[in-house]
Amino acid sequence: MMAMNEIELMQIKDFVKDMDKNQRIVYYEQKKKSVGIAVLLSFIIPGAGQMYLGRVGKGIILLLTCWLIIPWIYSIYDAYKSAKDYNAQLYSIIFSKDD
């Protein structure tokens, strides 16, 4: 499952292509998402972690079904996994070797 859409991936790749390693590190630190915030948001308001990660549609679905309890628990897990995936994908794009 893609954490970022293709347009965002291309924009980031194009933006960092002329950066040195230190600039890429700074850019990564600015762009990455907090796993803790994503989990906390989904714990407090199911689906809010997904919205924080830019997955608004999924967040709304989880919010509307959270009264079933299982989607709420899934929302917490998914926020954690999605934030980790987003950051890993961001890292691989920023620090790719094919520049």
UniProtKB/Swiss-Prot annotation:
Disulfide bonds: none
Tagged with keyword Ribonucleoprotein: no
UniProt keywords, alphabetically: Cell membrane, Membrane, Transmembrane, Transmembrane helix
Signal peptide: none
GO cellular component: plasma membrane
Transmembrane spans: 34-54, 56-76
Domain TM2, residue spans: 32-79
UniProt KW Transmembrane helix keyword: yes
Cell compartment(s), UniProt: Cell membrane
Taxonomy, superkingdom: Archaea
Membrane topology: Multi-pass membrane protein
Listed InterPro entries: TM2
Entry protein name: Uncharacterized protein MJ1516
Species: Methanocaldococcus jannaschii (strain ATCC 43067 / DSM 2661 / JAL-1 / JCM 10045 / NBRC 100440) (Methanococcus jannaschii)
